[in-house]
Amino acid sequence: QDLLMRQTGYSLLRSNDNGDTWEGPFPVNTAPVARENSGGCSVGGSGGGHIVELPDGGLLMPLEGAITLDQTAYAPGGVGELCRVFTLRSDDGGNNWEYWATVAFDPANVVYMSEPSMTRLQSGKLVCMWRVQIRPGFRFDNMWFATSEDDGASWSRPARTPLWGYPPDLIQLQDGRVLAVYGYRRDEFGVRGCVSEDGESWSKDNEFTISTGGDADPSVVNQYWHTAYPSVVQCEDGTVVVAYHEYSKGELPLQEMWVTRFKMG
């Protein structure tokens, strides 16, 4: 059962006709990273955690997870191992996957890192950004990031951005800038974006609003705040498309998928 938990925490669907039909799900081997507790997240990522293709044909998948099976890690007063951000690699087109590298991990088990997104720049540099929470109260911190110059075999020291939100999705735009989109689950709620010249220098001055609202009435929906999880692409005509989820209006709020399309300034 321990081996099964380590190998079936994440699955993939595959399409050979540009998304018209799909096969799967196919279990992904994530060993030695295992499911971290029965009451929280399994090994996984975020909705926008793109798989990155390398020049040699290898594929990198950014994920989160913990190696030990500590069911008390996220309980009040827990001290067990928290999530790390790591990557899997496939060299056969995504049929088989193996652990490749840890992107970021706090051995003190104070910083909880999860829901990563990764993009490869034209220079060859990889940029990975992720959601962060801090013990003991698991407060939501700003997003953090790291970079790699060797196709993900090793990573820079993690750095904290000035951007609050979660989780992020990253792409490099046609003009070379890097765009991060992320959920904003406080105040007016919604989805926000921020551009960086190099994927490493991030400023609140470059933050903008993509959508607002989408949260539900907390007296009606327990997880009224569960919105966003954006995924972003840039079309050939240069427009940017962001997909995300939010609650509908009305007496019985339902989760709906929305798409916003816009041009970058």
Where are the regions that the model predicts?
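Asp-box/BNR beta-propeller blade signature and adjacent active/binding-site loops
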Residues: 1-265
